[in-house]
A protein has these predicted regions:
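Polybasic/polar functional segments that serve as interface/processing modules
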Residues: 1-91
Length: 91
């Protein structure tokens, strides 16, 4: 199933600005290099300089999915730029 988040155990917001030109491999490298984590059973969210678009990485049994969302209206995400701005997520 494409982008089935029912098996996700945790959601991680990657603080700061991410180069949104990065592909699946580039975003997976950030997860492994900066956080020493594997991508299994987690959803990782990234935001660039413009806070109107995000990317998500999710591993599924048959591959890795990258989800890209750009807001079409004049709006933006409130994205933490450093660890002091991080808040807990519930869903």
């Amino acid at each position: 199933m494409l982008a089935d988040v029912s098996s996700v155990d945790a959601i991680y917001i990657v603080c700061g600005r991410t180069d949104m030109r990065k592909s699946i491999d580039g975003l997976c490298a950030i997860i492994q290099d900066q956080f020493s984590m594997e991508i299994d059973h987690a959803l990782f969210l990234f935001c660039g300089r413009k806070c109107d678009r995000i990317k998500a990485i999710l591993k599924e049994p048959d591959g890795i999915v990258m989800i890209y969302k750009r807001l079409t209206a004049q709006g933006s995400y409130r994205w933490p730029r450093n660890k002091s701005e991080v808040r807990n997520l519930t869903w």
